Swiss-Prot record:
Residues annotated for substrate binding in this entry: 140, 172, 206-209
Protein name according to UniProt: tRNA (guanine-N(7)-)-methyltransferase
Recorded GO CC terms: tRNA methyltransferase complex
GO MF assignments: tRNA (guanine(46)-N7)-methyltransferase activity
């Protein structure tokens, strides 16, 4: 059972921010395209609604599917891993589209840093939906404080989510699957709507999900609502 008296989360990032060496086009996407989409702070959100947030978008499949399916919604997509950022940007601008001038979706903002400072800076009750899809599970007990599903982050999300807003979580890791309900049952600001071992309708698939299923791991999908 998780220790709810655990120490506060370290105010630093863990894990890699770069994998394999970037190819020339990937570097151009980071240098020329990313600045065009980068989230510019709370003042840039005036009049923006509905507003969704994805924490750790991985390869970007889910984020792109959501903005295409919901053009009336603005999505802030967070990812620190450079190769994941490049994957998202290349989905938006496949070759030979120009990295500096080709049109980009107007309902997407990208945050290429730790999501927690972004959350702390958001106004109260601004988010309509939050996605946490297959986060790093940090399965060792001594690393539990690094997991995003954590009492401190849940409290921050409770402040910035509107009443009735939904937090969607997915994980294929058994440790995380036990961790999520233990943490969330203690959060009075959230109510469990549903948990399923089948991906619900309206949840775009991701490569991480496909990889888990191929490896014989069964994902779980949670839907929590802000009371």
């Amino acid at each position: 059972m998780p220790d709810m008296t655990m120490k506060s989360q370290p105010d630093r990032l863990y894990g890699r921010q770069r994998g394999h060496a970037l190819r020339p086009r990937q570097q151009r996407l980071l240098d020329l395209t990313l600045p065009r989409l980068r989230y510019a702070g709370p003042s840039s959100l005036r009049g923006v609604s509905p507003l969704w947030l994805e924490i750790g978008f991985g390869g970007g499949e889910h984020a792109v599917a959501q903005i295409e399916a919901h053009p009336d919604v603005t999505l802030i997509a967070c990812e620190v891993f450079e190769n994941g950022l490049c994957s998202l940007l290349s989905r938006l601008l496949p070759e030979p589209l120009d990295e500096e001038t080709a049109p980009l979706p107007g309902n997407l903002r990208v945050w290429d840093d730790d999501a927690r400072p972004l959350l702390r800076d958001l106004p109260d009750q601004v988010l309509d939906r939050v996605f946490l899809m297959f986060p790093d599970p940090w399965p060792k007990a001594r690393h539990a404080k690094r997991r995003f599903v954590h009492p401190e982050n849940a409290a921050t999300l409770a402040r910035v989510m509107k009443p009735g807003a939904e937090w969607r979580i997915a994980s294929d890791d058994p440790t995380y699957q036990a961790w999520v309900p233990e943490v969330m049952e203690r959060q009075t600001a959230f109510e469990l709507l549903a948990v399923s071992n089948e991906r619900p309708e309206g949840w775009p698939p991701t490569r991480y999900e496909a990889k888990a299923i191929r490896a014989g791991r069964q994902p779980l999908y949670w839907r929590y609502v802000r009371r």
